[in-house]
């Protein structure tokens, strides 16, 4: 009887612990989103990069909008595993915002880029960023020209290019499958 009570107490403690951790992670993600949006607004207002929190190793660099999908996310600098946990991010190997070339953004298939599974050629995409060279916000509009599933070794669509392009990449298939043997690539050209 006493063993049953101890076992019941342990199960209750374990359940409360798991529930508490889930609530903590959700609250942390919500707070991070608020801080990232606040840092983006500060960056646009001041013309200087603002980290979302003091120890952040990234900062917001753009806003990505896909109107048909009701998609509106802040893009972070540097597609590292830590940065990608908080939002879509710019690959360092791609073009810089506002410069000619292939601007490459990455995001997780289970969260930030999950809506891309519904994107189709012809969809408009808008990128907004603060151009520190001219001291003002700028916008570039794109149209999706291609959606393709490729092998991870096929990096031709991520390569630097003299052609202005926007490339969005995520793992494939979408969802929470343990494997992601392919990549889902969206290519868009400026209007």
What are these regions (language model features)?
Residues 2-191:
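Solvent-exposed, non-transmembrane regions of membrane-associated and secreted proteins
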